[in-house]
C-alpha cells in the first residue's frame, strides 16, 4: 500500500484517543459476546475490529501485512507506566528453530514497525471503562535493534540447545521469555539438552515494562 494508506491508518488510530472502550464497542456494527468482554485480550480484539485488521490473514502474518505494521496495545496506569510486559509472539520450540536468523524470524517481522496504542486505566478499572491514549508508530533505532537482537539471539541459543527451561526472568535486557498458556497443564514437545523429547509449557517473547516505558517517553 502507499504511504497515504499508512497515514490513513494512523489518523484513524489517533482519532480513537480519549474514547472509552465502551464507547468504541457501542460504535461497532456487530455484537460483542460477554465471554470476550471478560477475556484479557478483549481490548486488543476491539482495536483490531475498529481498525480493520483481517482476522483471517493467518497466524504467522502481522496485523497489516501490506503496510508492514503490527498493532500493539499497552495497558498503562494513570501515571503513564506500563502495567505489564507486552506480548510480542509465541516461540517455536521445535527443531525448525535451527534455521531461524534475526532478519527472517517471525519475531523480527512482528517488531519491525509497530502501531502502539496506550490503554489508560489502573488494574481495578474494568476493560470497558479504560480510555484510549494517543497512538504512535515506532520503528527500531539502530541502538534499539542492537539490544533487541542481542537478547533474541541469546534466548534462541538457549532454546536451540534444549535449555528453554533454564531461562528465567533474569535473562534479557529488554526482552523476556515467559510461559504463555491458559493453565499449567497445556504442554508442547521440545528436545532437551540431552536429546530427549520432553514436554513443557509454551513460551513467548515479551517486551519488558521498562522498555515499553522508554518507547512511551520517546513518543512524547
Curated annotation (Swiss-Prot):
InterPro entries linked to this entry? DNA_mismatch_repair_MutH, DNA_rep_MutH/RE_typeII_Sau3AI, DNA_rep_MutH/T2_RE_sf, Restrct_endonuc-II-like
Q: Which cysteine pairs make disulfide bonds?
A: none
Q: Please give the Pfam families that the UniProt record associates with this protein.
A: MutH
Q: Listed GO molecular functions?
A: DNA binding; endonuclease activity
Q: Does the keyword DNA repair apply?
A: yes
Record keywords: Lipid biosynthesis included? no
One GO process term, biological-process aspect: mismatch repair
Q: What is its main location?
A: cytoplasm
Q: Where in the cell is it found?
A: Cytoplasm
UniProt entry keywords in alphabetical sequence = Cytoplasm, DNA damage, DNA repair, Endonuclease, Hydrolase, Nuclease
Query: Would you name any one GO CC term?
Result: cytoplasm
General function of this protein: Sequence-specific endonuclease that cleaves unmethylated GATC sequences. It is involved in DNA mismatch repair.
Homology family: Belongs to the MutH family.
Q: What is this protein called?
A: DNA mismatch repair protein MutH
Give the species: Buchnera aphidicola subsp. Baizongia pistaciae (strain Bp)
Amino acid at each position: 500500500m502507499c504511504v497515504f494508506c499508512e497515514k490513513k491508518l494512523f489518523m484513524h488510530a489517533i482519532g480513537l484517543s480519549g474514547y472509552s472502550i465502551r464507547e468504541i464497542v457501542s460504535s461497532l456494527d456487530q455484537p460483542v459476546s460477554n465471554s470476550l468482554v471478560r477475556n484479557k485480550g478483549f481490548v486488543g480484539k476491539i482495536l483490531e475490529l475498529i481498525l480493520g485488521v483481517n482476522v483471517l490473514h493467518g497466524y504467522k502474518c502481522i496485523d497489516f501485512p501490506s503496510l508492514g505494521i503490527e498493532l500493539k496495545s499497552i495497558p498503562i496506569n494513570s501515571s503513564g507506566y506500563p502495567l505489564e510486559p507486552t506480548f510480542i509472539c509465541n516461540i517455536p520450540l521445535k527443531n525448525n528453530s535451527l534455521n531461524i536468523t534475526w532478519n527472517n524470524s517471525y519475531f523480527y517481522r512482528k517488531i519491525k514497525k509497530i502501531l502502539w496504542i496506550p490503554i489508560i486505566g489502573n488494574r481495578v478499572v474494568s476493560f470497558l471503562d479504560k480510555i484510549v491514549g494517543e497512538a504512535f508508530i515506532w520503528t527500531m533505532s539502530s541502538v534499539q535493534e542492537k539490544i533487541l537482537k542481542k537478547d533474541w539471539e541469546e534466548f534462541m541459543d538457549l532454546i536451540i540447545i534444549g535449555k528453554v527451561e533454564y531461562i528465567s526472568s533474569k535473562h534479557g535486557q529488554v526482552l523476556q521469555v515467559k510461559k504463555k498458556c491458559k493453565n499449567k497443564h497445556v504442554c508442547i514437545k521440545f528436545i532437551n539438552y540431552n536429546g530427549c523429547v520432553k514436554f513443557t509449557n509454551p513460551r513467548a517473547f515479551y517486551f519488558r515494562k521498562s522498555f515499553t516505558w522508554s518507547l512511551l517517553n520517546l513518543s512524547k
